[in-house]
Amino acid sequence: MTAVSNTEQWELAKQSLVTILSEKHYTPKAFAKALGSPSFMSLLKQIQPIAVPFFKALLGIKVRRHMLFRRDKEIQSYTFSYRSQTVDGRAVVLSGRVTFLHNKNGAPHQVKTLSLHTHQAFFHPEWTPSQNLMFMPLKVLWNSAVIEPDLQKWGITHGIEPDGGGSALHMARQLADCTVAALQIMQQHGVTLMPDGYTTNWGSSQGALPTLYFAKWYDTEAPQWFREALRLRATFSAEGDVPLYELTTYTYGNPNLVYEGHILLTAYFKAFSKEQKGGYDAAELVPQWFTEPRYEVDGRKITFLDALSHYYPQFTESVIKGMKSYAEMVAPDMLTADGEVDIRCPKVQAWLACLKKYNNLDDWTPAHEVYIAHSPADDMMPYEMVYKLYRTLSGEGQNPLVHMYSVPAMRILPHGGLNPHFIIAFVGQLLMACVENPEDMRKFYKIVK
């Protein structure tokens, strides 16, 4: 275990917060440009659909105001290693991080909430400053202990082979083990959860699916002592997406995860589609996904790969290179005669069998508040796929604990326009950090949806 509270990592976290909030360091124009907008006024116009109802909602919601800017307390952040296992029983050693306030004099301290945060890897240079580190200081200063698994290091070190299966479930179980290890570290430093405290389980993007599997495990399999220790109140799953190019980007072209990304895309059709019970074959749907003209650009429909080339040209080359290099080095039978990945090859089919066995949400009826948020503007994962997830978890809308919200946001554009990932991350993070109860969450979303 290594303390990192005074290192450059934590200084970067504090500086990112200062940079965002202080006009002395970050002018409105610079702030707007950082978010992809040409001017501050353009930024205001872009965020108006969500900003106005957002602040109106906060005025009518009970918000925690006891931010702890006290000299007798300090922020501690620890990276640590912990033991876990995969769904097929392989032992792995993973890493995570926990950040919390504690008393400088060593006296016991109680936090109001535990915040489980599953997004990208927390060491990723592109996303860390804009999402994890921007919000983590706020949550910690709101007297929340933030627990984060390092998904990137896990993936690169323990890339799942075709016979391993169930990567989202892997991450869910490892999030549980990460939480136990973090609670032990907190206890060693005299930090515990208040008697009326609770846990929020937040995940977006690549973390959205593991977050839901963790929530399912908590409701259906977690031991009683674990549930009593966490008191999970709400799960927030937003902008769930694991397309091939995104995993490539966030793992620096690691070929194992490029291959995994292709199969995880398939998993959405297996795990989230009610129609799978009627005989849908994911192996047939994935090629259709890549070849159907589903995206509109300049008034015309284009395919998934065309959209990838249009919106993310810098990623396309690494995606193709990574996938083919993996096949050439490890699994040449994955390639068809024309050099494309063959969804029908035995290794891919083995993955599908594992995913069908392990990655299933149809048999889970959530016993705590679950919020699923998505933006129709997000081309990374179509809104209709996320809506199928909601229908599955809510029993066609019959479970009042499951909520689906369409969050207004701008389309993803290389120049101008806010990334829906950022908007929903902001909404979800702030909501989980400052709102006292699920009733207020529902009140908020009824206004903004």
Protein language model regions, located:
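N-terminal targeting or regulatory segments adjacent to alpha/beta-hydrolase or S9 domains
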Residues: 1-75
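N-terminal cap/lid segment of alpha/beta-hydrolase-fold proteins
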Residues: 56-109
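Short, surface-exposed "cap/lid" segments of acyl-processing enzymes
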Residues: 86-95, 99-142
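Alpha/beta-hydrolase active-site loop
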Residues: 165-189, 215
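Conserved alpha/beta-hydrolase "acid-adjacent" motif
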Residues: 210, 365, 379-387
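Accessory cap/linker subdomain of secreted extracellular hydrolases
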Residues: 238-363
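C-terminal catalytic histidine-bearing segment of alpha/beta-hydrolase fold enzymes
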Residues: 347, 352-353, 380, 387-388, ...
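Short beta-strand/loop motif that positions the catalytic acidic residue
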Residues: 366, 371-378
